[in-house]
């Protein structure tokens, strides 16, 4: 294992400290617990707060999307581990400006359990909440069980749209409805080429022989749907799109936003090869590509591989995607 770290047990805390030192104009800690970060201007009276959270190891997910026009706060867990109930509640309290708080995070058992308990604590304090779960990973469950799918890179679209809705003054129910609309129209699938090495143990998160790939792998190394010889960029994109396109029922005249995401150790050049084939496939179908995002949006430490997310859009969602936003890891002018 080769990593640029100090004490593995302090990996997350030192990383958070680095973010705070590098971006004091955008994020801050509301209290003594540095596992809770909020926008520097939170709380804002009358503005709906949006709180996300989850395990570390996925930057810029989750903590990298705290900022203007995005999330208001984040609860930070250890690597691949859920934040505590108290951290989830503290993040919500710190961003509540009287308009309520939307919890928007990926659909993972530990996160759901702790955030749900935080909702109970917040009710005692009179803070109104709503919850929307990112569940865009089409490999994790069939279409008829879409609400049980894992949340992966496609949650970026929900952050962006819901954050813009909150910024323009929408109510809590309206912001939650925007987030749910995005979730209902987003589909993602990934491919893994090499495992993540956990900083605390030095152990690989899964085994993948040299020369093989795994289609549908999760961002924690959860098993995919197909393992076999490494394909070409076009073959990989086709395998992913053969699941993602029909999942959304895309056809001629439909409009989409495309996100090609790197998982941590994949060169940007290779992501553009995946985008190239994605563009070709959608163009052949007569699907209009309205927006394109290529880069690292949800990683898994140094896992090699990538994912393709498609969001079916309309005029409302495009307006929200184009609204100004700024966080340590994302900017929309």
Label each PLM-derived region with a short phrase.
Residues 58, 62, 67-98, 245:
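Glycine-rich oxoanion-binding loops at beta->alpha junctions
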Residues 168-273:
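Mixed-charge interfacial surface used for oligomerization/domain docking
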Residues 133-185:
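Short alpha-helices
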Residues 2, 48-55, 71-74, 78, ...:
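Short glycine-rich or small-residue beta-strand-to-loop segments that form or flank ligand, phosphate
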Residues 243-333:
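C-terminal non-catalytic interaction/assembly regions of soluble proteins
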Residues 112-126, 145, 270-276:
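Short Gly/Thr/Asp-enriched flexible loops that form oxyanion-binding sites at enzyme active sites
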Residues 1-50, 315-333:
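N-terminal amphipathic/basic leader segments beginning at the initiator methionine
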Residues 74-79, 123-148, 284-289:
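Short, acidic/small-residue loops that bind anionic groups at enzyme active sites
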């Amino acid at each position: 294992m080769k990593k640029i770290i100090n004490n593995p047990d302090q990996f997350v805390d030192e990383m958070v400290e680095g973010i705070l030192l590098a971006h004091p104009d955008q994020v801050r800690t509301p209290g003594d617990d540095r596992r809770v970060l909020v926008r520097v201007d939170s709380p804002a009276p009358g503005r709906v707060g949006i709180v996300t959270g989850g395990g570390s190891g996925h930057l810029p997910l989750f903590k990298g999307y705290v900022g203007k026009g995005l999330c208001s706060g984040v609860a930070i867990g250890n690597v691949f581990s859920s934040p505590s109930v108290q951290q989830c509640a503290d993040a919500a309290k710190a961003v509540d400006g009287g308009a309520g708080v939307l919890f928007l995070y990926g659909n993972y058992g530990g996160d759901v359990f702790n955030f749900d308990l935080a909702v109970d604590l917040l009710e005692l304090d009179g803070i109104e909440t709503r919850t929307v779960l990112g569940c865009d990973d089409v490999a994790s469950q069939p279409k008829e069980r879409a609400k049980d799918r894992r949340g992966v890179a496609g949650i970026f679209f929900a952050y962006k749209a819901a954050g813009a809705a909150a910024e323009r003054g929408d109510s809590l129910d309206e912001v939650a409805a925007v987030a749910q609309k995005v979730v209902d129209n987003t589909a993602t699938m990934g491919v893994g080429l090499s495992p993540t090495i956990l900083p605390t143990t030095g152990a690989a998160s899964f085994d993948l022989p040299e020369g093989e790939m795994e289609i549908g792998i999760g961002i924690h190394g959860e098993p995919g749907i197909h393992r076999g010889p490494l394909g070409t960029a076009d073959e990989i994109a086709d395998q992913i799109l053969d699941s993602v396109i029909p999942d959304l029922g895309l056809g001629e005249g439909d409009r989409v936003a495309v996100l090609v995401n790197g998982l941590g150790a994949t060169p940007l050049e290779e992501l553009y090869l995946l985008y190239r084939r994605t563009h070709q496939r959608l163009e052949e179908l007569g699907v209009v590509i309205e927006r394109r995002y290529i880069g690292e949006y949800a990683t898994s430490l140094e896992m090699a591989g990538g994912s393709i997310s498609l969001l079916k859009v309309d005029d409302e969602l495009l307006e929200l995607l184009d609204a100004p936003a700024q966080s340590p890891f994302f900017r929309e002018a």
